[in-house]
Amino acid sequence: GNEQISLAKSFNNNWENSKTVHPIVAPHETSTVSPKVLKELSNYALENNLLTHIHLAQTQKEMEYIKSNFETSPIKHAYNLGILNEKVIAAHCNVVEDGDLELLAESKAFPIFCPTTHGIAGKPMNTNFLSELNVDWGIGTDCSGGNDDYDMLEEMRTALVLNNSVAKKDFIKPKEVFRKASEE
């Protein structure tokens, strides 16, 4: 709520000139943060040139909640709120409907593939389609709730296995996985 927003703004103000600490805005996900707060945080991030990190379209439960409350998918909901842009790091984006990934492309948000978490859920990110849409994407480890080892080499291996098991064409190459896991 308001107290957490005030704390986040205070944290940013205390560190905004730091050469080593770079605050970001990080609302959890579209089903746990109200539309009002999501918009407020997005506006604050844009006004202060901060990145925003959000877990987006991660689970079927999130999809069902957003569908029942907003009659759309989590990605379309975020897009309709105006919170997707080139400063957004969107973890997951693996429980999607037709048109969702195209909205990520249009908004220039940066999706993060969390292979271990997606593998456990049985719902890997469609990295080939993202690449066809010219959407840049990266590889991450997720949080302790979805992954308990934070091993980037294991995530890279899992990314190869998952992608190549669901790809309809053009398997992802190890060189590409290394780039996605290591570039800024």
Segment roles from a protein language model:
Residues 1-93:
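Metal-coordinating catalytic core of metallo-dependent amide/deamination hydrolases
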Residues 25, 55, 90, 104, ...:
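Divalent metal-coordination and catalytic microenvironments
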Residues 29-31, 58-60, 94-96, 115-119, ...:
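Active-site-proximal loop/turn and secondary-structure-junction residues that shape catalytic pockets
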Residues 44-51, 83-86, 103-112, 132-137, ...:
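Glycine-enriched alpha-helix->loop->beta-strand junction motifs that scaffold or abut catalytic
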Residues 67-72, 91-97, 118-123, 145-151, ...:
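A general structural motif
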Residues 80-87, 128-184:
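His/Asp/Glu-enriched, well-ordered alpha-helical/loop segment
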Residues 96-99, 105-127, 131-135, 139-141:
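A conserved active-site cap/scaffold subdomain adjacent to cofactor or substrate pockets
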